[in-house]
């Protein structure tokens, strides 16, 4: 694991990897990748932690589990690999991005440029079987990703937590709101986007807070590839 994570996350999380739940999770993943098609590719599972170091996290956008279609998931919540059509939730995120800050809708769905600026795109479950949403729920991932939220919560430097939908909002109890800033709304899914996601202005609100605390805002615009 030390080779996979950048050093800042390794220092924060190394004790987790020795715990029984993680050993069981690891064995389960070996079996799953051997016997089924599982997303994302093994080298991409920890991309959220690879692209965004512990010290550089400014914003967390919490997702549920990876996209379960071919070629979509690459270890960043809501993001898809270049060349793959953005799924409906991501299309709605782009609509809100345009309405909120006037950014053009990009010709791709990769959010890597956000991750490189300090946006931790974290799913609560990091793997999934092809075509089977939530198939790796309750297997141990939640314990690891809760610990990621916990180490950020303990950090002195404030973090913006963007929580879309009830699943993400269940994590509110882990966040000290006297120290960190929470932006919440319904999920960008087509089933709920019109119930309050559209018009919630998460991108400008996050930047407004970052500027208030003297931090660099995120450039949310996504250049075409």
Swiss-Prot record:
It catalyses: Hydrolyzes single-stranded DNA or mismatched double-stranded DNA and polynucleotides, releasing free uracil. Its main location: cytoplasm. SUPFAM superfamilies: Uracil-DNA glycosylase-like. SMART domains: UDG, UreE_C. It comes from the Bacteria. Keywords: Cytoplasm, DNA damage, DNA repair, Hydrolase. One of its GO terms (biological process) is base-excision repair, AP site formation via deaminated base removal. GO terms for molecular function: uracil DNA N-glycosylase activity. GO terms for cellular component: cytoplasm. Pfam families: UDG. InterPro entries: UDG_fam1, Ura-DNA_Glyclase_AS, Uracil-DNA_glycosylase-like, Uracil-DNA_glycosylase-like_sf. Signal peptide: none annotated. Its EC number is 3.2.2.27. It is an enzyme of class 3 (hydrolase). The active site is at 65 (proton acceptor). Coiled coil: none annotated. It is found in: Cytoplasm. PANTHER family: URACIL-DNA GLYCOSYLASE. Belongs to the uracil-DNA glycosylase (UDG) superfamily. UNG family. Excises uracil residues from the DNA which can arise as a result of misincorporation of dUMP residues by DNA polymerase or due to deamination of cytosine. This is Uracil-DNA glycosylase. It comes from Bacillus licheniformis (strain ATCC 14580 / DSM 13 / JCM 2505 / CCUG 7422 / NBRC 12200 / NCIMB 9375 / NCTC 10341 / NRRL NRS-1264 / Gibson 46).
